[in-house]
Amino acid sequence: MTGSARLVLALLLCAGAGPARARAQEADAPLDGPRRIFQDSLLEHLTGDWSMAGRVRGRPVTYTLHAEWVLNHQFLELRMRDVAEPPAYQAMVYLGYDNTSERYVTHWLDAFGGRWSETLGYGQRAGAAVRLVFEYPDGPFHTTFTWNPKDRTWTVLMEDRGPGGVWQEFASYTLHHK
């Protein structure tokens, strides 16, 4: 092999090593952590300011909701607040994703205090909906966020177990962008 042929071969080998090394580093990157940013095309539709009208145990309620990515884009923070003064209800919800377990994880902190905020919610996406399950001390609770692309609204349905173990609506809301 001539000297110029060796030089060309060496350059080709070096050029191929860069992309191969980058692919190896990507394969070795952890599934979760600060370098694995949470990207979710469905939840991206939830960012911004919303009016949130609905019913809780049959009673009409109106809230405001502000949603934005926080904590290095690892969580979508939802800030809910009753429009009444003083507010009858407030919540801060942190919705993220656990890549290792392949599920959503949710921290729901609200005006009801620590007892009900100690439970994490876990969920899955099905089409345009994310269904979360919370195993509270007094029983399981479902919260489903559903994106309605036609009218660009969200619906939120919350369900708990009633007498006899039958699932019943706890609350339902429709969100409209402000």
Residue ranges and their predicted role:
Residues 1-8:
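Bacterial N-terminal signal peptides that target proteins for export
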Residues 3, 16-18:
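Residue-identity detector for glycine
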Residues 6, 21-23:
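Basic polycationic patches enriched in arginine
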Residues 8-16:
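Bacterial N-terminal signal peptides
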Residues 23-178:
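Hydrophobic small-molecule pocket/channel-lining residues, especially in calycin-type beta-barrels
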